[in-house]
Amino acid sequence: MSKVVKLQANDSHEFDAYVAEPKGTPRAGLVVVQEIFGVNQHIRSVADRFAQEGFFVVAPAIFDRAEKHVELGYDDRGRQKGVALLQKIAIDDTLKDVDATLHYASSESGKPAGVVGYCYGGTLAWLSATRLTPGAVVGYYGGQIVKFAEEKPRVPVMLHFGRKDDHIPETDVAKVHTAHPEVEIYWYDGGHGFNCEMRGSYNEKASKEAMARTLAFFNKYL
């Protein structure tokens, strides 16, 4: 079952969040953090997929601080709009929304909540691990993680990257690995966005492998 709820951050900002509920008792809570394209069809499908695996899933509309109801396509126009919206919102404010979503997911599931993020959401997932209190974190192709590599994760972290990703140099990932050898890092024969079936860079094999590892990771730590 899915629905949209309104949540409130600790600065009183209200934002929408897509909720996907599992059948039966939740295994744990899970926050799905969007790419720069909003809580679109793909992100909702990701949330639904995790709900099928038993998680109580919540995807916050982090662009609500700049514009409501953002759903962008995977083309140049959508990318430009997403980047423009991103630049209007301070990352600390975005993390307030993620934090509020974490508390909601944990409260509603009655279990610890993790975070999984994609693209920009992958970077936010990393910052959730270093600044917030999730149970565990997974990040997919977070291109800005290297900028925050000096921050130490408080919880177990797994990161997924594509070897054909033109946006993320392998040297950047190496810096993160050197600083935090305890972080699980996996490489795939894919490009940026290899998990998204709506992108030309979608790689089914890589997507399935990453999902299997992600589920095993969350099942271990949440």
Regions found by a protein language model. Name each.
Residues M1-L222:
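N-terminal cap/leader regions of alpha/beta-hydrolase-fold enzymes
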